[in-house]
């Protein structure tokens, strides 16, 4: 029997791209810069005030919960003037109708000023900073269009955020270069006072498109792996080494998204990150012109759901097509994954990385599988302990004392 369609069983979430893919940096591994090729007919790729208002009103009215989260992403979001985001706040207040509105914005940090930071603090915006660890690691790939390094400017921006008391977190890309130095990486974030950290593995394949794009879509078999991609072995070693440092010293003080999500899956709760969830499809993207796509990592013509001027957000995000997109994260898992002891923790990770084949030659295996399996095997005793603590309504941070006492 076909399951009943319940469109409001989960919240609607759409990330906004007010500047499209435009950016003042040209990071070698960026998967979004080349999206400009999809909109060559739009010389000025910025969200208009008209579209902004339509999106904000419709997005708020589409929510079934009293809290509404807006996420502003790029490209480089601060290439839009401060007046644009002041307009955002005005419109949110106009259409809130009693709902609590929260905002988070992702930036490379190089354009931050006192004025920006005052705005973020006054309006309680959460700021995500893209920074790839210490200067040597960061500047390897994160440079501007003239090839000049960006680390110094990013740190100036972070210091401004701290000066003004702005809430912020770190997002670091783990690549072929920095993956070999997990402790230096992690300790750097502690030194700069970053307590919430997301480590994202970069995996891309090369595929020449007629329109100038050079990265493969999830449906294409890329000619070769991009040189900056982290290897499965590197990823596994990185996570295990990092975890050993964290679980002995920093549980409850420093929060690493992947570790928190893993523990959530261990106790049967929602992981809070789509890549480790059973299904996905609940986090869409709206481009500067109103085009809506299935996911930030699936901004390709094949995954365009429509345009906000032609369809509502509800129609697109709860469409059968998007439902299928999300369900296929689970239904298209190869047999090796379905029979894996850690399926509950991994759930196949992100579908965009499922271009490897299993030992039996079945397609659809995640490229990073070996690394994740190494990680889950390594952390299992500690996760089991923290799970017991949580179920007994005790602090997971008790794991640190248990390790010191030799109980684990």
Protein language model annotation of sequence segments:
Residues 23, 27-30, 274, 280, ...:
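Disulfide-bonded cysteines in secreted/extracellular proteins and peptides
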Residues 28, 32, 132, 211-218:
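Short, flexible, mixed-charge acidic loops at enzyme active sites
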Residues 56-57, 61, 79-198, 205-207:
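Conserved AdoMet/S-adenosylmethionine-binding subsite of the radical SAM
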Residues 288:
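A cytosolic small-molecule/anion-sensing beta-strand core signal
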Residues 299-408:
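Flexible mid-to-C-terminal extensions adjoining Fe-S/redox cofactors in radical SAM and related proteins
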Residues 144-152, 159, 163-275, 279, ...:
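Radical SAM enzyme [4Fe-4S]-AdoMet core and its adjacent flexible, acidic
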Residues 1-118, 122-124:
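Conserved alpha-helical substructure of the radical SAM core
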């Amino acid at each position: 029997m076909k399951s009943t369609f319940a469109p409001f069983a989960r919240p609607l979430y759409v990330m906004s791209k007010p500047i499209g893919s435009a950016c003042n940096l040209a990071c070698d591994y960026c998967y979004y810069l080349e999206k400009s090729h999809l909109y060559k007919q739009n010389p000025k790729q910025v969200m208009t005030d008209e579209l902004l208002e339509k999106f904000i009103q419709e997005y708020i009215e589409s929510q079934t919960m009293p809290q509404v989260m807006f996420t502003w992403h790029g490209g480089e979001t601060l290439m839009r003037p401060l007046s644009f985001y002041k307009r955002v706040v005005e419109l949110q207040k106009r259409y809130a109708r009693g709902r609590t509105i929260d905002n988070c914005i992702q930036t490379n940090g190089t354009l931050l000023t006192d004025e920006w930071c005052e705005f973020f603090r006054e309006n309680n915006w959460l700021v995500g900073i893209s920074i790839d660890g210490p200067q040597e690691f960061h500047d390897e790939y994160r440079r501007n269009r003239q090839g000049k390094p960006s680390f110094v400017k990013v740190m100036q921006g972070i210091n401004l955020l701290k000066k003004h008391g702005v809430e912020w977190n770190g997002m670091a890309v783990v690549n072929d270069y920095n993956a070999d130095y997990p402790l230096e990486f992690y300790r750097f974030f502690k030194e700069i006072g970053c307590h919430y950290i997301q480590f994202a593995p970069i995996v891309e394949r090369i595929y020449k498109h007629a329109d100038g794009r050079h990265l493969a879509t999830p449906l294409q078999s890329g000619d070769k792996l991009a040189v900056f991609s982290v290897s499965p072995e590197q990823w596994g070693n990185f996570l295990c080494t990092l975890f050993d440092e964290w679980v002995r010293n920093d549980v409850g003080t420093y929060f690493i998204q992947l570790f928190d999500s893993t523990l959530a899956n261990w106790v049967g709760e929602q992981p809070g990150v789509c890549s480790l969830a059973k299904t996905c499809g609940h986090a869409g993207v709206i481009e500067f012109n109103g085009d809506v796509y299935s996911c930030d990592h699936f901004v390709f013509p094949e995954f365009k759901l429509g345009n906000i001027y032609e369809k509502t957000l509800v129609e697109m995000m709860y469409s059968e097509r998007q439902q299928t997109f999300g369900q296929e994260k689970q239904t298209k898992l190869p047999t090796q994954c379905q029979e894996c002891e850690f399926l509950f923790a991994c759930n196949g990770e992100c579908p965009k990385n499922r271009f490897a084949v299993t030992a039996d030659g079945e397609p659809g295996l995640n490229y990073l599988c070996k690394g994740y399996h190494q990680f889950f095997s390594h952390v299992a005793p500690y996760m089991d302990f923290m799970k017991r603590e949580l179920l007994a309504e005790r602090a997971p941070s008790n794991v640190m004392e248990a390790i010191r006492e030799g109980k684990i």
